[in-house]
């Protein structure tokens, strides 16, 4: 904080130099106005940085939470985490609630009913315990996902959300959502969405495809055991 105080102090001394010079007072006044505006924004910048730091801390907390589970693989953001362990036939989903407590959901493979991927709330692929398969993501990969966007999305060439929805046999918590794109609270969030060919979208689709594939395999395994 000390270096900022010195920087602003030097800036206003610089402005004072112009104020004391004939013919340059207008410039000095303009520079002071700009400096005051920047100074007024400083608390908001500090608050935003604290929020970013907190989200990063939350992401790290979720990443290392329940380390004893030793999953085969996991994915986490600052508010959710999904993991699975084939030898235990378990999926675990963790969610950070508003009170910053981590809620843990343990889901046996046999309890996974359905998995679907949606781009901008439009379902592009779905697998179900009933055997229903929709969309072409698993068959055609990321290219199929992009091709499955609506005409309006194609015209806009922007995607705002890539979401995995998992339905399970649990009346207390039957539906879980995993978001693969940055949300509004995250640094770098773009309110307009992200271009379809951007690295952000490609990575989000790769992650979504993988976890959707994991759910597909889990559902098939459970169906074989039930037969």
Swiss-Prot record:
It comes from the Bacteria. One of its GO terms (cellular component) is plasma membrane. It is found in: Cell membrane. The keyword Glycosyltransferase does not apply. It is a multi-pass membrane protein. The chain crosses the membrane at residues 16-36, 131-151. The keyword tRNA-binding does not apply. This is SPbeta prophage-derived uncharacterized membrane protein YomJ. It comes from Bacillus subtilis (strain 168).
